[in-house]
């Protein structure tokens, strides 16, 4: 497996990412991986995101994980670290994904141009799960998505009421970010086809469960990869 550090432009900013792929696969499927909020472990080296990238790349996908603006070495429009912190704190307080969706869209456009395929998938974790879901609704080329630790209690899921794409929701039974009651209520707004997978004796961070989660996403993507 090759991991290639790449850069792409988003809203006038240079963002960083890591493209993972098997050089022996000539026509890979592609998958974009959206990390969580930077104040909650959210960069492209997050344990869940890196596991997804590795497992997918080892199974015929080219995956791109990336850092949102102001995270890691990705540029921002703020002048210093304190301003970047306040920027992301305001996003967390307002549950505002708009800039992150712009960055994820730019990442997807880069990935699509780099690999030259329309066979696309997306996965996101926590805050990134919401970004991935919103991008899935907006982008007709995305075949299916995996949403991990979706913060059901903070975001309205009715925008998925007409989404007919295959959807996987992985949730922990002891997740501080959302309760099982909130998961159940949120799932009621989401159309079929959908899969809810609740992982027992697990919390929001999925320590030692990363490979299991990645394989769940892989199965969903593989089962929906045929033209």
Residues of each region from the PLM?
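Short beta-strand/loop motif that positions the catalytic acidic residue
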Residues: 163-164, 168-171, 175
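Catalytic histidine-centered segment of alpha/beta-hydrolase-like enzymes
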Residues: 202-214
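Primarily recognizes the serine-hydrolase "nucleophile elbow" in alpha/beta-hydrolase
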Residues: 99-164
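Serine-hydrolase catalytic machinery in alpha/beta-hydrolase-like enzymes
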Residues: 8-117
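Acidic catalytic loop of the alpha/beta-hydrolase fold
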Residues: 173-178, 204-205
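C-terminal alpha-helix
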Residues: 110, 216-227
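Catalytic histidine neighborhood in serine/cysteine hydrolases
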Residues: 189-205
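A domain-start/cap signature at the N-terminus of enzymes
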Residues: 1-7
